[in-house]
């Protein structure tokens, strides 16, 4: 019985370790992430890819910052070889009506000012971008 108990404990530890490794996320450092900006028609998309191809990225948007800015927090995690990931990177986009008006997520229109800032949170720093500056699809 002792051998069975030890085997069960070892299997549980290995399973727990593998599960933690592939499900535990972290905020990546800025030097680990490639960020691109692309404009297709009126839609500007920011794309975030980890330089390590075995790491997938997700992005979470937070409107509730104290200064009223929009904040993207990136999250990285190891790619699980047992699950097919639909995408490697994280994406966030704006639909511009013109250079100073965008559609909000609820479909309403919003006039942009110089105070409308997008903050991208990395482990080592925050990058601030004026949303108006994204209208041409360049960073």
PLM features: residue spans?
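Membrane-interface helical sensory segment of bacterial ECF anti-sigma factor regulators
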Residues: 1-41
